[in-house]
Amino acid sequence: MKTKLSTCNVWSLLLVLLVWDPVRLVLANIQEDEAKNNITIFTRILDRLLDGYDNRLRPGLGDSITEVFTNIYVTSFGPVSDTDMEYTIDVFFRQKWKDERLKFKGPMNILRLNNLMASKIWTPDTFFHNGKKSVAHNMTMPNKLLRIQDDGTLLYTMRLTVQAECPMHLEDFPMDAHSCPLKFGSYAYTTSEVTYIWTYNASDSVQVAPDGSRLNQYDLLGQSIGKETIKSSTGEYTVMTAHFHLKRKIGYFVIQTYLPCIMTVILSQVSFWLNRESVPARTVFGVTTVLTMTTLSISARNSLPKVAYATAMDWFIAVCYAFVFSALIEFATVNYFTKRGWAWDGKSVVNDKKKEKGSVMIQNNAYAVAVANYAPNLSKDPVLSTISKSATTPEPNKKPENKPAEAKKTFNSVSKIDRMSRIVFPVLFGTFNLVYWATYLNREPVLGVSP
């Protein structure tokens, strides 16, 4: 029984193999024929679509307005140039419209094509109003995508890198915020022929890749969209606007400018604690800090465009410069009054000595006159001669009169101006910093509003 069963299984397997090979070949031939038929069908569809198609004419010419739906996917944003007031953005720019001439029927609902077909049909003549330079990527082939649906709806996508203008108001620099626009629209068609519409809402029509930020000095806060109509001598045109909201990072400028300025001001106030007689040391402090502030103010302006107004950093540097220069003027004032005080002290000492010498001379002159008047009678009167001798003989036990101490120059003394400056200067500078940082850091960023 076992031998008969095994023999039956072998014959069954051989029979299946003999039957399956022809069936497999037949199925493969059928699939190959279907693929060839599909290619043939698609080729015929495309040929039929382009037969009599004029890509010089827009869809719905003379009947309706062509509506172009757009959205943008940002793959890379930045860098932003402050000196040139421009930014660079890399995007997938998508446009969608309907062309009744491209309706078709076939086994597929969507035809997925490349840039070769895009050059044979009508496409919107979109350009960027504020673009300084735009590049369409062509490596290794033009980065373009075209999809045609069976109802005539087309999706046209291309990869672009755009350098666009970004108007900046730098009054609050470096605590400033900006709204960089990207404006685009039709170059030739007015609003009565072609109009643009955002495909989705504000958050979905312009999307930024999670790793798309290429900003070192800014934070990308978000984006908004808008639409406006501009008038020119050739008609009215639709302009689509996407705003990218930026907030500057202050850390770099704190390290490079603010901290050095603060330390320079503090260093200039160290001279208040030096002796007023230390002229070389205090002069070095004053001149060095003034030159340092000059260098800092020049270097801070190098990274900015040459604007005609003062920025927040300019005001800070100007006030710091005023404090440093005031410290130098304070030393000059202290030095002037110190030397003037010494001069008055010396003059008073000289006057006292002159007065004392004058009184001695007056006494000697009076005595000489008395002697001269009574000299002829001294020999006649023995009493007068005795008195005159006793008058000329000094008294040995007479104590000298107490004379006022001579004024002396006082060294290592502290000026009243220095004492006041030690308190007034730090208090004023601290108050200025408190008001300055509280004003600018708590201020809400002023961003451009989309029309």
From Swiss-Prot:
Region feature (Disordered): 389-408
Gene Ontology cellular component list: axon; chloride channel complex; dendrite; GABA-A receptor complex; GABA-ergic synapse; inhibitory synapse; neuronal cell body; postsynapse
Signal peptide: 1-28
Residue numbers on the Cytoplasmic membrane side: 271-280, 333-420
Membrane topology: Multi-pass membrane protein
Main location: membrane
Gene3D superfamilies the UniProt entry points to: Neurotransmitter-gated ion-channel ligand-binding domain, Neurotransmitter-gated ion-channel transmembrane domain
Listed Basic and acidic residues bias regions: 396-408
Localization (cell): Postsynaptic cell membrane; Cell membrane; Cytoplasmic vesicle membrane; Cell projection, Dendrite
UniProt keyword terms in alphabetical order: Cell membrane, Cell projection, Chloride, Chloride channel, Cytoplasmic vesicle, Disulfide bond, Glycoprotein, Ion channel, Ion transport, Ligand-gated ion channel, Membrane, Postsynaptic cell membrane, Receptor, Signal, Synapse, Transmembrane, Transmembrane helix, Transport
Regulation of this protein's activity per its record: Activated by pentobarbital. Inhibited by the antagonist bicuculline.
Annotated S-S bridges: 166-180
Residues given in the record as 4-aminobutanoate binding sites: 94, 157
GO terms assigned for molecular function: benzodiazepine receptor activity; GABA-A receptor activity; GABA-gated chloride ion channel activity; ligand-gated monoatomic ion channel activity involved in regulation of presynaptic membrane potential; transmitter-gated monoatomic ion channel activity involved in regulation of postsynaptic membrane potential
Gene Ontology biological-process entries: gamma-aminobutyric acid signaling pathway; inhibitory synapse assembly
Extracellular-side segments: 29-249, 301-311, 442-451
TM segment ranges: 250-270, 281-300, 312-332, 421-441
Reactions listed under catalytic activity: chloride(in) = chloride(out)
List of glycosylated residues: 38, 138
Modification after translation: Glycosylated.
PANTHER family: NEUROTRANSMITTER GATED ION CHANNEL
Quaternary structure note: Heteropentamer, formed by a combination of alpha (GABRA1-6), beta (GABRB1-3), gamma (GABRG1-3), delta (GABRD), epsilon (GABRE), rho (GABRR1-3), pi (GABRP) and theta (GABRQ) subunits, each subunit exhibiting distinct physiological and pharmacological properties. Interacts with UBQLN1. Interacts with KIF21B. Interacts with LHFPL4. Interacts with SHISA7; interaction leads to the regulation of GABA(A) receptor trafficking, channel deactivation kinetics and pharmacology.
Family under the similarity heading: Belongs to the ligand-gated ion channel (TC 1.A.9) family. Gamma-aminobutyric acid receptor (TC 1.A.9.5) subfamily. GABRA2 sub-subfamily.
Main function: Alpha subunit of the heteropentameric ligand-gated chloride channel gated by gamma-aminobutyric acid (GABA), a major inhibitory neurotransmitter in the brain. GABA-gated chloride channels, also named GABA(A) receptors (GABAAR), consist of five subunits arranged around a central pore and contain GABA active binding site(s) located at the alpha and beta subunit interface(s). When activated by GABA, GABAARs selectively allow the flow of chloride anions across the cell membrane down their electrochemical gradient.
Domain notes for this protein: The extracellular domain contributes to synaptic contact formation.
Protein name from the UniProt record: Gamma-aminobutyric acid receptor subunit alpha-2
Organism: Mus musculus
Organism phylogeny: Eukaryota, Metazoa, Chordata, Craniata, Vertebrata
